[in-house]
């Protein structure tokens, strides 16, 4: 049964108060750290956080997925173990989910001008991160028994640059592009969670050759860093959640879309304050495999707006 919800949520979210949108607290230590790739410029590692002791790791007899996370930072900064993610990692593990947080190369580090006009530079940075995500995925699949991961039950998630990467990655997977050669043949992710993400296309409107995995998107309608709607020039386009959801709706894909009215890029760091939305998506759309379609407009005066970096000028200096 398909259920589509159209609503405006005015209460129920906590304030987003940390500089990067995440509330910092006591560090959570990974249960294991592994090098998954050796590049010319650096070694790439991933941290594994197992479900908390005593937590429920199944739902109605079905195993909960592993959440594979990519940090934010505009492709110029950020780390897989940033303290700002502690609370969210702990929330997920206490709810029975395994979390894997990965490194990726920062393809825009050192760039002094970044935007759609510098599309080749941006494209390279995005696909460099996608390449590292696919390498991490291959490592996880190849070592699934050791890591305790079901290869068919991996949900990719990201914040800001990480969200762009996971959305782009699923786009590449669904279109079987050359970037996916690292992945096992026929591999599919079980779901996607994007906190202020987008997709870069050189072929006009975003088109999926295969039906995308269940996808959850959260995006501020006033986001000026990762544009909420789109930036387009002929066939070149950078499409945010506000535009992508129209494609998902038109073609009947499985999605949850949360539009944060008047919010900027702080939604990229809203993971620990939107946990209930995530758990509902993971439990219903991913684990139970139901096509629960939700499109919601959220406006909560108690959620502080304007936290963290809000523009390209602030982040890149141009």
Where are these regions (language model features)?
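Bacterial Sec-dependent N-terminal signal peptides
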Residues: 1-25
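N-terminal cap/lid segment of alpha/beta-hydrolase-fold proteins
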Residues: 22-62
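Short beta-strand element of the alpha/beta-hydrolase
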Residues: 61-74
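Short amphipathic alpha-helix adjacent to the substrate-entry channel of hydrolases
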Residues: 80-102, 109
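Alpha/beta-hydrolase active-site loop
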Residues: 120-145, 240
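Primarily recognizes the serine-hydrolase "nucleophile elbow" in alpha/beta-hydrolase
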Residues: 138-211
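The feature captures the conserved acid-bearing segment of alpha/beta-hydrolase catalytic domains
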Residues: 180-251
């Amino acid at each position: 049964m398909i259920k589509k919800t159209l609503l405006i949520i005015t209460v129920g979210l906590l304030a987003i108060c940390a500089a990067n949108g995440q509330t910092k607290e006591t560090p959570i230590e990974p249960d294991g750290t592994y090098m998954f790739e050796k590049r010319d410029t650096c070694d790439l590692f991933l941290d594994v956080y197992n479900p908390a002791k005593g937590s429920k790791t199944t739902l109605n007899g079905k195993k909960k997925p592993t959440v594979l996370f990519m940090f934010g930072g505009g492709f110029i900064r950020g780390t897989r173990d940033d303290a700002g993610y502690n609370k969210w990692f702990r929330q997920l593990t206490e709810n029975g989910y395994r979390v894997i947080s990965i490194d990726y190369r920062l393809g825009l580090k050192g760039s002094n001008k970044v935007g759609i006009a510098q599309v080749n530079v941006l494209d390279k940075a995005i696909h460099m991160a996608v390449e590292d995500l696919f390498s991490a995925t291959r490592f996880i699949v190849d070592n699934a028994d050791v890591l305790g991961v079901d290869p068919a039950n991996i949900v990719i998630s990201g914040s800001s640059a990480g969200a762009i990467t996971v959305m782009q990655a699923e786009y590449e997977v669904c279109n079987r592009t050359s970037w996916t050669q690292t992945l096992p043949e026929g591999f599919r992710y079980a779901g996607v969670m994007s906190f202020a993400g987008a997709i870069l296309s050189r072929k006009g409107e975003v088109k999926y050759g295969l039906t995308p995995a269940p996808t959850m998107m959260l995006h501020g309608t006033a986001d000026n860093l990762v544009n909420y709607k789109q930036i387009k020039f002929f066939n070149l386009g950078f499409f945010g959640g506000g535009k992508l959801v129209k494609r998902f709706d038109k073609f009947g894909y499985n999605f949850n879309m949360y539009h944060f009215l008047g919010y900027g890029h702080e939604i990229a760091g809203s993971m620990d304050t939107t946990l209930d939305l995530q758990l509902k998506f993971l439990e219903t759309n991913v684990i139970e495999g139901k096509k629960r379609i939700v499109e919601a407009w959220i406006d909560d005066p108690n959620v502080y707006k304007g936290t963290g970096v809000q523009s390209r000028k602030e982040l890149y200096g141009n």
